[in-house]
UniProtKB/Swiss-Prot annotation:
GO cellular component terms given for this protein: cytoplasm
Name under which the protein is recorded: UDP-N-acetylglucosamine 1-carboxyvinyltransferase
Domain of life per record: Bacteria
Known EC number: 2.5.1.7
Assigned protein family: Belongs to the EPSP synthase family. MurA subfamily.
Species lineage: Bacteria, Pseudomonadati, Pseudomonadota, Gammaproteobacteria, Enterobacterales
Keyword Nucleotidyltransferase: no
Protein source organism: Escherichia fergusonii (strain ATCC 35469 / DSM 13698 / CCUG 18766 / IAM 14443 / JCM 21226 / LMG 7866 / NBRC 102419 / NCTC 12128 / CDC 0568-73)
Sites of 2-(S-cysteinyl)pyruvic acid O-phosphothioketal modification: 115
Entry annotated with the keyword Transferase: yes
Catalytic activity: phosphoenolpyruvate + UDP-N-acetyl-alpha-D-glucosamine = UDP-N-acetyl-3-O-(1-carboxyvinyl)-alpha-D-glucosamine + phosphate
Function: Cell wall formation. Adds enolpyruvyl to UDP-N-acetylglucosamine.
Amino acids binding UDP-N-acetyl-alpha-D-glucosamine: 91, 120-124, 160-163, 305, 327
NCBIfam families reported for this sequence: murA, PRK09369.1
Amino acid sequence: MDKFRVQGPTKLQGEVTISGAKNAALPILFAALLAEEPVEIQNVPKLKDVDTSMKLLSQLGAKVERNGSVHIDARDVNVFCAPYELVKTMRASIWALGPLVARFGQGQVSLPGGCSIGARPVDLHISGLEQLGATIKLEEGYVKASVEGRLKGAHIVMDKVSVGATVTIMCAATLAEGTTIIENAAREPEIVDTANFLVTLGAKISGQGTDRITIEGVERLGGGVYRVLPDRIETGTFLVAAAISRGKIICRNAQPDTLDAVLAKLRDAGADIETGDDWISLDMHGKRPKAVNVRTAPHPAFPTDMQAQFTLLNLVAEGTGFITETVFENRFMHVPELSRMGAHAEIESNTVICHGVEKLSGAQVMATDLRASASLVLAGCIAEGTTIVDRIYHIDRGYERIEDKLRALGANIERVKGE
């Protein structure tokens, strides 16, 4: 397994170009299964999960090519089962189910894998599809969905806000007969992006970005060209990198209006922030950040995917900060690893109390999930001495060339090939 070796401390400064959003690219790739004409998807990040999704679409019979953009032609899809071999590494594969059953009347997906953070059950996906008229069976580790004729529009009230299930229901409803209303829908920018992609193909969707999405079913979806929105979590991660190293950064190809909650907390921490249409700049003027209190919740509140990075910020900030995680359980696995580097923190149920220290020291640490591992790499950039971050395959699932981008900002980081 590959590792990162990071020498610190360094001040991170310069410019970084933000990649397309993984959390929009994945649902959009699977939504392309609904199209009866070729689609071109631009600004798709080069990531492990994206490669796995493309491989899965190919196995289903779609023609998939990548030459800058990703081209998908799903006209000849003739396999309706997403096998365990591919699904086990990535829970996003569940998003194949809605498009398959909506367009072909059948689909099966192995129960998914992915990051090990808390219970992320597929029951909300299943109940949504059942309400649209699909018959669902769980057999031999597979979710099997089928319908006679077309799915039927329905008024669906989500038990809890779920990005994944909102995507599944919205995609399936585009080809259903009649109108579907999703109440308590997720409002994330990536949901809006997926909806806008479907509209480009001819879907009739309104209300995306609010908690009530309306989909009027159409008979077929055509082709089109679509550009994936910038990755707000990657943007936030690099902004935190500059903040904790007392540096200065400009993020290009960013979308500031998707990051309001994060930018507000960075300003509270003492950062000087400016924004334009597609850029964000942050300048700490050489100052140490101030501790902030953060509570994660569904969008537009503070994103859970930025929690680990802000935990790190608080651990090297002036003062004491409280971080409360309300979205996923079991999401403080980075805290004991950061403690090995000299951080002072206590975990009390779903809150971590961070007591800022002047400096961290390099250590050997282990990545546990995608965002936690990014925070360990950033910790290595500002710690004194050498930090080895193990199991970095987690990072490769969600960050495109993170070491190259950090190096361009002045980090001393190298990838060490594993046995």
